[in-house]
Amino acid sequence: MLRTSLRSVRVLGGRPSVAAAARQWPVAASRRAALVGQRHYAVDKKPESASSPSLPNTQSVASDKIHETTIDDVGETKAATVDAPKTTPPPPPPPPAPKKKGFFRRLRNFVFTLFVLGAVGFAGGVWYSCFSDNFHDFFTGYVPFGEQAVLYLEEMEYKKRFPNSATNAKSRDADGAVRIPAQSGASWRVADGTRRSSAGPVPAKQEEPKAEAPKPKAAEPKPTAKVVEKPAPTPAPAPTPRSESGFKAPEVNEPSRYPPLKPIDLLSLDDAREPVIQDLVHMVNDLILVINADGAHGRYGSSVNKAKNEITKVGGKLKGMKEQFEKKAAGQVRDKIDEFDKAATDLIDRVESAMITQESQWRHEFEEEMKKVRENYEDRVKVLLERERKLNEEKLQNQLLEQALALKKEFVKDVENQVEQERESRLGKLTALSSAVADLEKLTTGWNEVLDTNLQTQQLHVAVEAVRASLEDDHHPRPFIRELVALREIASDDPVVNAAIASVNPTAYQRGISTSSQLIDRFRRVANEVRKASLLPDEAGVASHASSWVLSHVMFKKQGLAEGNDVESVLTRTQTYLEEGDLDSAAREMNGLEGWAKTLSKDWLGEVRKVLEVQQALDVIATEARLQSLRVD
């Protein structure tokens, strides 16, 4: 009746005879064989007031001396502790002088420190592997025994979080034994409603409470435990208490007996697939097992049945909600699938059209690129063919030279061999042959010199003609430094050509010279000014200048090669020589003028002199080239 009856009784220093609620049946069954010969007695505590037992859902006031226990406290007891007397410790002795550590001690300390650090590092790595995936992969892959340690830690964590998992249930079914309680015989005790303990194989004896009037005695069942070994392939049977059908009513001359109460059936939900419902079912079943084991099913039966009904209702509601959610989710998934199918069809159409467009564009670009590649390839082939042709020609020429040298060497070798063989008889022929070869070499050398001279002469002619062409083609004066440099490079060793080039005024080839048409145009302008100046006296005024300008336009001009030394005659002859291309005679005529006429024509004479110097130098160079060609002939 008292709550203290739920507490197990054990000898000080021994093990508890009742296991915890979550593991009561397997552990209790495994210890049954060791407890067959022992009897344990509950603590004799008399109730202070005869108060009726109260259900868990009602409020009751218990004694302060009685410790209230719960289902979690079942199977757990606290050993008595003895307080040791407190004594004042003696003062510590003075520390001994430090000794110098030996090599082996330092080695031992080093190894121990290394071992401790390694163990701490290994444990830290195992612990950190549970939080970091990257470190988990590194630790299990590269550290020895790291994977086994991490798996062991994860398994222990899983067992700690889910103690009633299926694996533990299978192990309990495989290792546990089945207890079959039995009730038989009669007891001399008076039926007092005390608890029928199932903690041990034999119930503990209790003293009969004192009463003024005698009470009828009732037979108290004496449960006995039998250890039944179950076969390996079959699961362990559940405890089967006796049913009411096995109860036999007492006879008239026998003391009264009450039928035993039916134990509470375990809760079972076939369609309970939710983890929460399964956990609730396991919890309720553990509670029912504890209540049945303590014989308190008469008091807690209605509450347990109510809890079972509530759990069944909750399971039904969860199942209905799950079905409703599944239907709703199926509808949403169906709508999403249709929407995705439509979107996928549209996307496929767009992708196909884009692919067709892209394919046509790529085909066009490919054709253009192939055309460019073909053209580049053809150009490259042409360049390569031309290069190969030149290389082949050079190789052929080199081969011919090598062959000529080889033939010459062979010839010389043959000659030497022949000379060695016929030295005495053909020494004269060898000398003649050597002289003939020397003559041929001299002749070949002479012809080479002739060819070089002819080539130099031709190049000299070409350079002179290039200078003349550059002077005659341009409408404006242009420098001809490059032509003169080329001409000097060709005739670098000829003193006549060098002297002719040196006689040319540097201003002429740096700025260029005027052409014949330019000289004639400039002469006409100069002639007008000279005519005006020829009509003026030495000390002329404004009127004289005006009259000379008028008379210069009114005077009749002469034609041809006019005779006389007057200014008009000289100008007429000069113009005639210019039109005929005789710059030398024209310059000589203009150089014969005096006074203002000569002063006005001084610049023109300078230009004509430059042209004549250049022409004279070119004539000298051309004459020298002809002379060299005649010398060669």
Swiss-Prot record:
Transmembrane parts of this sequence: 110-130
Compositionally biased tracts (Basic and acidic residues): 205-220
Segments for region (Disordered): 40-100, 164-259
Key word Transmembrane present: yes
Residue spans, topological domain Mitochondrial matrix: 42-109
Membrane protein topology class: Single-pass membrane protein
Coiled-coil stretches noted in the UniProt entry, renumbered to this chain: 304-421
Biased composition (Pro residues): 87-97
Mitochondrial intermembrane side stretches: 131-633
Polar residues biased stretches: 49-62
Transit peptide: first to last position: 1-41
Residue ranges with Low complexity bias: 77-86
Keywords annotated in UniProt: Coiled coil, Membrane, Mitochondrion, Mitochondrion inner membrane, Transit peptide, Transmembrane, Transmembrane helix
Top-rank taxon: Eukaryota
Subunit field text: Component of the mitochondrial contact site and cristae organizing system (MICOS) complex.
Protein name according to UniProt: MICOS complex subunit MIC60
Protein source organism: Fusarium vanettenii (strain ATCC MYA-4622 / CBS 123669 / FGSC 9596 / NRRL 45880 / 77-13-4) (Fusarium solani subsp. pisi)
Lineage, uppermost ranks: Eukaryota, Fungi, Dikarya, Ascomycota, Pezizomycotina
